[in-house]
């Protein structure tokens, strides 16, 4: 997050990787520059609307509540038009309601943007609620792989995360 920039500028920066104008075009503000800037502004506003951030478009990003900052980070990532979206502990610091909203948002993103999502997360409710396939690590080593249902009943996973006494 670029905390000192506005919400819309945070998203526009990500779209800038797709512009074709050069520095000279930007300095003289020629037609190519102006039309591309208008285009990325409109695209950024569309993403902000999707993530319910359009009313905060001109607010400084650091002034947003934590949950909205997370949504802004995801919107900015989607502006790069990825094929794979990496979400590293997106629920960290969120309250249960924000986590529930995040779960719904991740499901919607996967469907609407037709992309793969790599989720690294400790909130098992979120993991079980959005993942089709789960890889479980213990001390950096893979100990299990499978569907949420398979992982939920995997004795090795239960032992590693809840303790051996839970199994016995």
Each language-model region and where it sits:
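Glycine-rich phosphate-binding loops of nucleotide-dependent enzymes
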Residues: 1-168
